[in-house]
């Protein structure tokens, strides 16, 4: 029996089922990656977690269950996403596996019948064989990592699912606490009664020792990124009034909260006396209608309200920032847009605090930046964390936003390295009086590939940053011809 491959895959004969059972364990799969290329854009651990084994050929990996094979990995690829596109019926990717007398779970992340999670709360129950696979696959694709879809009940504390109930829990909130009950309750947190410790009603995660610079949503998202509330998932909760509260689960229903405002024309009419600096047409297009009280607006679909608008704020971005689960927002802008807004906001918030130079704060900022997948990839390519952080800070200071793609970050890092090298060279070299013709000749030579001396330089080597060869000659070298550093990545550039 063979698997008919698509582009980026190969055909393999299905292996023996008993042999495959060895690789139900993620650890056993990871051991096959001992000789996996370190220069691969997707890490061995990510591929193993997605059910793959290393074949020993190039960057080709193969699923232990469906035996689909994938190669030619690129930066930004989702291991689980490509796995599911190539083999949508794979038992592993859908949360099931072969049955040997009893149901054997192969949900990614399960080992010895238990779930593994970075933010694990309490014990995990065995996977339920009759659970619809869509739940599992949806989370794998959206978060890129394993989350608990066992029989654990969500929300963890149904009594606190409404923001009103959470606010009431803060009656004895200590005076020394830096954050307000309103902000904490809005982020899904209620007071436990101990010190300044709060707990999420949904995932059960606990947070305490708040600092003045902390923001409730950011800390909740940073420490418990798989929380269903943080992800904006529908867990079928209702507020005390029987209707989803504004901040709980904006996407908990496919029906709009205010059908009368579902049309753009109906919403724009409500801005008749609008005096705020934010464009009313943009607000209406983003799903908001005016309440007639100052600059207060509300989304017709999720019911989320916003106020105190600043001139530079974009309605779509604020909608995504505060109400990421809104179905209207999701339909209009897509999940990738929402994810990018939250990633950018987290980085700007962290980097924007660098004016306060306390050791504990600096460490917290560094930890937040370091957890960014783009930063981890750049570090793996040989760039220093110090240079990455500096480049990201400069990006935010000059443009007001952070990086949304790894390629742009790498290009700026390479450019910064080149500028530093040129500055050092100009400081130490003697100024020579040379003719215009000689300068032109040298400039032309500098652009030529140092190997063939025929074509122009088109590749920069990472991590050394040297500009040495054309594209054709670069394919034939593994070490930089100038410094003999092992090349981990070859970045194409365009020289003017």
UniProtKB/Swiss-Prot annotation:
PANTHER family: E3 UBIQUITIN-PROTEIN LIGASE XIAP (PTHR10044:SF115), INHIBITOR OF APOPTOSIS (PTHR10044). The gene is Xiap. Expressed in small intestine crypts (at protein level). Expressed in bulge hair follicle stem cells, sebaceous glands and dermal papillae (at protein level). S-Nitrosylation down-regulates its E3 ubiquitin-protein ligase activity. Autoubiquitinated. Ubiquitinated by TRIM32; leading to proteasomal degradation. This is E3 ubiquitin-protein ligase XIAP. Residues 141-149 are annotated as: Interaction with caspase-7. It catalyses: S-ubiquitinyl-[E2 ubiquitin-conjugating enzyme]-L-cysteine + [acceptor protein]-L-lysine = [E2 ubiquitin-conjugating enzyme]-L-cysteine + N(6)-ubiquitinyl-[acceptor protein]-L-lysine. InterPro entries: BIR_rpt (IPR001370), BIRC2-3-like_UBA (IPR048875), IAP (IPR050784), XIAP/BIRC8_UBA (IPR042579), Znf_RING (IPR001841), Znf_RING/FYVE/PHD (IPR013083). Its EC number is 2.3.2.27.
